[in-house]
């Protein structure tokens, strides 16, 4: 379904995956495998199809989160290509971009950008932002708890932190009937199998499809996945009060992980 969403037919999808799996079983260095698999995907047009799908992904997420944004300054932490931030800015919010590397599209947005250092404190003063977005970010952090503390520090009292996370150990009961039907293969898996699916797609999407020769541009993949309940417990411990959780399910065809949206209020 991932390749189908990119316009790749079933026969070619099978061939591409067979080649990638062949490399996966016979590599001496993980970086060599990632590059070899990336080259296969690039030769078959998979990589070139991604940018258009990222526009669709930004539009999907924008619809999911826009009603939760408060008026004022928004920090898009882990902004990626900043396409979502552009949509938020068009709504009238002032947006600050931040990420560990600068995507080529960032400069085209005209929005302010701050280059982050992996594992370092967020380089903004206390109580600066009305909204802080961390959209599929926490599971890429080596220390999600410290990142939560920093997120709370830079967000105003009463401000809002909006999180989307890839989760596991879900049964889909919160989804509509149509959404459950689309997700039935994933939902039939055990919790550990769901976690492993997340690991596979997280690595495949971030380190194979988006492979880079530059070590500083390789996405960090420590696979810090949690269940929705475990995320809530961690948020509570940092006085990030969960006002609402929305089960989005496998809502993004190019990244078919089960997502939940967490709307948090900053208590200080």
Predicted regions located by residue number:
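Conserved alpha-helix/loop element of class I SAM-dependent methyltransferases that forms part
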Residues: 51-71
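A short glycine-rich, Lys/Arg-flanked "PGG" loop and its adjoining helix->strand segment in the class I
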Residues: 145-157
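C-terminal alpha-helical "lid/dimerization" subdomain adjacent to the S-adenosyl-L-methionine
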Residues: 164-238, 244-251
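Class I SAM-dependent methyltransferase Rossmann-like catalytic core
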Residues: 34-57
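Short catalytic micro-motifs in class I SAM-dependent methyltransferases
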Residues: 136-137, 165
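A conserved beta-strand element that flanks and buttresses the S-adenosyl-L-methionine
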Residues: 133
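Conserved class I S-adenosyl-L-methionine
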Residues: 71-80
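Class I SAM-dependent methyltransferase SAM/SAH-binding core
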Residues: 79-121
């Amino acid at each position: 379904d991932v390749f189908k969403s990119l316009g790749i037919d079933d026969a070619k999808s099978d061939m591409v995956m067979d080649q990638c799996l062949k490399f996966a079983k016979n590599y001496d260095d993980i970086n060599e495998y990632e590059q070899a698999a990336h080259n296969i995907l690039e030769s078959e047009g998979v990589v070139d199809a991604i940018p258009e799908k990222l526009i669709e992904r930004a539009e999907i997420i924008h619809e999911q989160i826009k009603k939760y944004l408060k008026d004022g300054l928004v920090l898009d932490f882990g902004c990626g290509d900043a396409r979502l931030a552009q949509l938020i800015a068009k709504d009238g919010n002032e947006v600050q971009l931040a990420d560990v590397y600068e995507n080529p599209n960032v400069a085209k947005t005209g929005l302010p950008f701050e280059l982050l250092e992996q594992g370092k404190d967020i380089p903004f003063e206390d109580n600066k932002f009305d909204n802080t977005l961390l959209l599929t970010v926490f599971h890429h952090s080596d220390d999600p708890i410290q990142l939560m503390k920093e997120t709370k520090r830079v967000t105003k009292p009463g401000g809002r932190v909006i999180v989307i996370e890839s989760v596991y150990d879900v049964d889909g009961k919160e989804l509509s009937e149509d959404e459950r039907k689309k997700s039935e293969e994933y939902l039939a898996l055990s919790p550990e199998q769901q976690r492993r699916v997340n690991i596979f797609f997280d690595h495949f999407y971030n380190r194979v499809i988006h492979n880079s020769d530059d070590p500083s541009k390789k996405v960090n993949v420590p696979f810090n996945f949690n269940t929705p309940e475990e995320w809530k417990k961690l948020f509570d411990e940092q006085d990030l009060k969960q006002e609402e959780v929305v089960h989005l399910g496998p809502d993004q065809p190019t990244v078919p992980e089960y997502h939940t949206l967490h709307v948090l209020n900053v208590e200080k």
